[in-house]
């Protein structure tokens, strides 16, 4: 059986390589045809998931997709993307342009190469251990997790943490404090898993939430972080309505995405219409969700030239059928809304840049805690000997952060180290009777414990 399976996989790979040789992928980058955007055209043989790979390449370069026209019905894949850089200008950096050509073109390292489809966006490494966490969102969770890892002589090299509807998900890359390499001792890995599991369990008492999950594994089989966070949230069913009505989100100042799904019976398509506030990586989040739910995007039109984004998808199941029932239709709508909202972070954006050291993340979250700040989302990166961390913060009641509080924190951490980016968002506090919803804040007074989740 193993021989047969191996033979089958090798044949599929050889067939894919033959198709690429006969019809190699083609990428054209045009900076002349449009005044304000760079136009990227991609043609290739079609394959399920290719659209996601292309969108991922563009979003990982921090490019903004202003418009897109997608056609991948049948055996050919043809896309046009109008993109700008982070500053809203045409993409003129030749290093970036060459990376796009290499990643989307006929090169063997291209996302169209069969060997690269499952690894794009993943840095194969044995230099760190991957920790995946899901559980109930509650006050002080991040600080407690960081404290446990520090006590276990683990250094957090990179991390990303999301919260949504009283759920928390995190993907952390950690190393041994002494050797700065991956942790391989089975007993130590088991201890890390066990103690982190205890921390995650601490906030679920008395509420109807799923059991927390902790996974500690080698980085060799690591999934792209954004994909994994979506999958962790999806597996924890954050798209379901929990004990409070989903309409409460409007009362908390959130803007609910407008998503509709209908069938075009004459052509056996289902049409997905999305209207919501535009933001970075929005297209990736929606395309990933549809792909991960085993839908094929046959045609699509994307318009995000203004503050609102409009997305229209013509989809089918991988078996060629449209959405088959009202229950399935509602599930697609719920899952897309959840995917859009998971990455949204209201609050004041803080960026920390300083020399990296063991325990830095623990110290920073402790300072936030001592000043009664709540972090709604965090991204931790290490580049060389530098730590580059981003936090979205609010005060304990969900209101805008007081300027004096921020300045006090900057005095402690260092004004050149901690920078304020953007302004506070206007947001209402969560209802008093909603489930606890701060992943990261630890409050000075226990009287704040019953405040609810403030997210959007």
Swiss-Prot record:
Keyword Metal-binding: no
Entry keyword annotation includes NADP: no
Gene Ontology molecular function: amino acid binding
Tissue: Expressed in stems and siliques.
Classification via Gene3D superfamilies: 3.30.70.260
Name recorded for this polypeptide: ACT domain-containing protein ACR5
Annotated ACT domain residues: 39-115, 130-207, 271-347, 349-432
Keywords associated with the record: Repeat
Induction per the UniProt record: By dark.
Function (record text): May bind amino acids.
One Pfam family it belongs to: ACT_ACR9_3rd
Organism: Arabidopsis thaliana
CDD domains: ACT_ACR_1, ACT_ACR_3
């Amino acid at each position: 059986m193993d021989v047969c399976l191996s033979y089958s996989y090798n044949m599929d790979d050889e067939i894919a390589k033959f198709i690429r040789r006969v019809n190699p992928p083609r990428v054209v980058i045009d900076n002349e045809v449009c005044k304000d955007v760079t136009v990227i055209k991609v043609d290739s043989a079609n394959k399920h998931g290719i659209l996601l790979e292309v969108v991922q390449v563009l979003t990982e370069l921090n490019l903004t997709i202003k418009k897109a026209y997608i056609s991948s019905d049948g055996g050919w894949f043809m896309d046009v993307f109008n993109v700008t850089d982070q500053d809203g200008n045409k993409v003129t950096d030749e290093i970036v342009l060459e990376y796009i050509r290499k990643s989307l073109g006929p090169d063997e390292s291209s996302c169209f190469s069969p060997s690269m489809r499952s690894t794009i966006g993943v840095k194969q490494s044995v230099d760190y251990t991957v920790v995946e966490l899901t559980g109930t969102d509650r006050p002080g969770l991040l600080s407690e997790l960081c404290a446990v890892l520090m006590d276990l002589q683990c250094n957090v090299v990179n991390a990303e943490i999301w919260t949504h509807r009283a759920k928390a998900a995190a993907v952390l890359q950690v190393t041994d404090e002494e050797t700065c390499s991956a942790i391989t001792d089975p007993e130590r890995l088991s201890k890390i898993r066990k103690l982190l599991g205890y921390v995650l369990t601490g906030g679920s008492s008395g509420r109807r939430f799923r059991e927390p999950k902790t996974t500690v594994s080698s980085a060799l089989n690591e999934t792209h972080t954004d994909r994994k966070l979506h999958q962790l949230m999806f597996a924890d069913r954050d798209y379901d309505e929990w004990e409070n009505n989903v309409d409460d989100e409007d009362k908390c100042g959130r803007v609910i995405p407008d998503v509709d799904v209908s069938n075009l019976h004459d052509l056996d398509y289902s049409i997905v219409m999305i209207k919501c506030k535009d933001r970075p990586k929005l297209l990736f989040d929606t395309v990933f969700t549809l792909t991960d739910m085993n839908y094929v995007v046959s045609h699509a039109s994307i318009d995000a030239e203004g503050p609102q984004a409009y997305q229209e998808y013509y989809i089918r199941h991988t078996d060629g059928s449209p959405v088959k029932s009202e229950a399935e239709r509602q599930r697609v709508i719920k899952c897309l809304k959840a995917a859009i909202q998971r990455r949204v972070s209201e609050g004041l954006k803080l960026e920390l840049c300083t020399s990296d050291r063991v325990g830095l993340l623990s110290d920073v979250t402790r300072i936030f805690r001592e000043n009664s700040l709540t972090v709604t989302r965090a991204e931790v990166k290490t580049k060389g000997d530098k730590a580059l961390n981003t936090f979205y913060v609010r005060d304990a009641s969900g209101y805008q952060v007081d300027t004096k509080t921020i300045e006090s924190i900057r005095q402690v951490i260092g004004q050149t180290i901690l920078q304020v980016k953007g302004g506070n968002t206007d947001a209402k506090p969560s209802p008093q009777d909603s489930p606890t919803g701060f992943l990261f804040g630890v409050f000075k007074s226990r009287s704040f414990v019953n405040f609810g989740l403030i997210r959007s």
